[in-house]
Curated annotation (Swiss-Prot):
Lineage of the organism: Bacteria, Pseudomonadati, Pseudomonadota, Betaproteobacteria, Nitrosomonadales
Key words, A-Z: Aminoacyl-tRNA synthetase, ATP-binding, Cytoplasm, Ligase, Magnesium, Metal-binding, Nucleotide-binding, Protein biosynthesis
Cofactor: Mg(2+)
Cofactor binding note from Swiss-Prot or TrEMBL: Binds 2 magnesium ions per tetramer.
Protein name (record): Phenylalanine--tRNA ligase alpha subunit
Length: 345
């Protein structure tokens, strides 16, 4: 390689490369030019590899010149890249301009789910009249869910279409009554509790879901009467719906774990008892089942049914939430639609 010719070519090469860098309009263009001159097969790289063809006297001189040229190109590349990036940022800021005079956006806040809100209200009202709260497992045995509650082996509630059975002879509780059995086994009267929680049944439609919430109540003592049961439930319903003149009625019914048993109706809160689609034009809405605890249940937990007496009741939390908030489809509570849920906050 002729020394003077190589030097002339090197100067032309640097000038041409810098001109290309200065005319580049994008980072992509810069990378292509960089590869052309500074890449593994670029022209500067080829010149550096050609140093071995020079004489020992020429090699250090040309090596220094080529490295200087390489440094000039790298500086030009960095300068142009910074310029293009600043230009791109300015254009982006112009497109996404921020008006600092606008008020700030607050952080979104969550709210209490309407079913949870209803459950809290129920617990608070019963707590105000002396009831404690008891909880228990959601996976139960046949004994606690059925046998101890006087539900015979051939009772329809034990069928697969009503109950979720799991391995090991266990099942998902179909009501929170098992909590009462656990509690009575471990506590002596007087007993005055409610048992809120999730329960499970094989059912799904407009008014039923496979999982829902119940609150069951129990009062065991020496002189608890059916009139006390009526007084507690009437007081609760009138406070829950905030209607002091709410009409109620008790109808005879049957439950294996209570005797006598009754179902409680209230005057339809949608039409004030006049009759509408919600109440089936009857003017009444069924809200809960209740009764005096059956002697067989007492015997299963070791209590003397001659000495102690009590009442029990059970109500659906979603049912009361639907009536309180005017919701006509139970499934809306579990679809996680924020448009629906935000109405309650």
């Amino acid at each position: 390689m002729n020394h003077s010719i190589a030097m002339g070519n090197l100067e032309d090469l640097v000038n041409a490369a810098i001109k290309l860098f200065d005319n580049a309009e994008s980072i992509v263009d810069l990378e292509q030019i960089k590869a052309q001159y500074l890449g593994k097969t670029g022209e500067i790289t080829i010149l550096l590899k050609g140093l071995r063809e020079l004489t020992p006297e020429e090699r250090p001189v040309m090596g220094e010149r080529i490295n200087q040229a390489k440094k000039l190109l790298e500086d030009a590349l960095i300068e142009r890249r910074n310029l293009i990036q600043e230009k791109n940022m300015s254009a982006r800021l112009a497109e996404e301009s921020l008006d600092v005079s606008l008020p700030g956006r607050g952080l979104g806040m969550g709210g209490v789910h309407p079913v949870t809100r209803t459950l809290i209200r129920i617990e608070s009202l019963f707590h105000s009249i002396g009831f404690g709260v008891a909880t228990g497992p959601e996976i139960e045995t046949d004994f606690y869910n059925f046998t101890a509650l006087n539900i015979a082996e051939n009772h329809p509630a034990r069928a697969m279409h009503d109950t979720f059975y799991v391995d090991g002879g266990k099942l998902l509780r179909t009501h929170t009554s098992p909590v009462q059995i656990h509690y009575m086994q471990n506590h002596r009267p007087p007993i005055k509790i409610i048992a809120p929680g999730r329960v499970y049944r094989c059912d799904s439609d407009v008014t039923h879901t496979p999982m829902f919430h119940q609150v069951e109540g129990l009062w065991i003592d020496e002189n608890v009467s059916f009139s006390a049961l009526k007084g507690v439930l009437v007081e609760f319903m009138r406070n829950f719906f905030e209607k002091d003149n709410l009409s109620v009625r008790f109808r005879p019914s049957f439950f294996p774990f209570t005797e006598p048993s009754a179902e409680m109706d209230i005057a339809c809160v949608m039409c004030n008892g006049k009759g509408c689609r919600v109440c089936g034009e009857t003017g009444w809405l069924e809200v809960l089942g209740c009764g005096m605890v059956h002697p067989n249940v007492m015997n299963h937990v070791g209590l003397d049914s001659e000495e102690h007496i009590g009442f029990a009741f059970g109500l659906g939390v979603e049912r009361l939430a639907m009536l309180r908030y005017g919701v006509n489809d139970l499934r809306l509570f579990f679809e996680n639609d924020l448009r629906f849920l935000k109405q309650f906050n």
